[in-house]
From Swiss-Prot:
Disulfide bond entries: 33-58, 34-74
Alphabetically ordered keywords of this record: Chemotaxis, Cytokine, Disulfide bond, Glycoprotein, Inflammatory response, Secreted, Signal
Tissue-level expression: Activated monocytes and activated T lymphocytes.
SMART domains according to UniProt: SCY
Signal peptide feature range: 1-26
Species of provenance: Homo sapiens (Human)
Family: Belongs to the intercrine beta (chemokine CC) family.
Function: Chemotactic for resting T-lymphocytes, and eosinophils. Has lower chemotactic activity for neutrophils but none for monocytes and activated lymphocytes. Is a strong suppressor of colony formation by a multipotential hematopoietic progenitor cell line. Binds to CCR3.
Protein's cellular compartments: Secreted
Post-translational modification: N-glycosylated.
SUPFAM superfamilies: Interleukin 8-like chemokines
Glycosylation, residue list: 115
Protein name as it appears in the record: C-C motif chemokine 24
Length: 119
């Protein structure tokens, strides 16, 4: 009987500890940070997107580029080529916005009488 009481007490203690350890509400996940910048420029046609690393959460402010193959690298935001890549990617994103890419169907819709069903 003493063994059962020890197990129950231990489980209650673990439950109380777990309740205080597990955070409540939303958990803030820091954004990726740049530890170093690439020394060579990556060809612009391989880059598909970018995101900024925050200076408030990272030691260095940087631009994280993603390539077509999913590889990521950091660029120095002070470099001219990094600023140009960001500007060009922003322009591409603007062109690809849903409002600009609305497609209209031209011509009449054809209906085939053989496909209709009657009840």
């Amino acid at each position: 009987m003493a063994g059962l009481m020890t197990i129950v007490t231990s489980l209650l203690f673990l439950g109380v500890c777990a309740h205080h350890i597990i955070p409540t509400g939303s958990v803030v996940i820091p954004s990726p940070c740049c530890m170093f910048f690439v020394s060579k420029r990556i060809p612009e046609n391989r880059v598909v997107s970018y995101q900024l690393s925050s200076r408030s959460t990272c030691l260095k402010a940087g631009v994280i580029f993603t390539t077509k193959k999913g590889q990521q690298f950091c660029g120095d935001p002070k470099q001219e080529w990094v600023q140009r890549y960001m500007k060009n990617l922003d322009a591409k994103q603007k062109k690809a916005s849903p409002r600009a890419r609305a497609v209209a169907v031209k011509g009449p819709v054809q209906r085939y009488p053989g496909n209709q069903t009657t009840c």
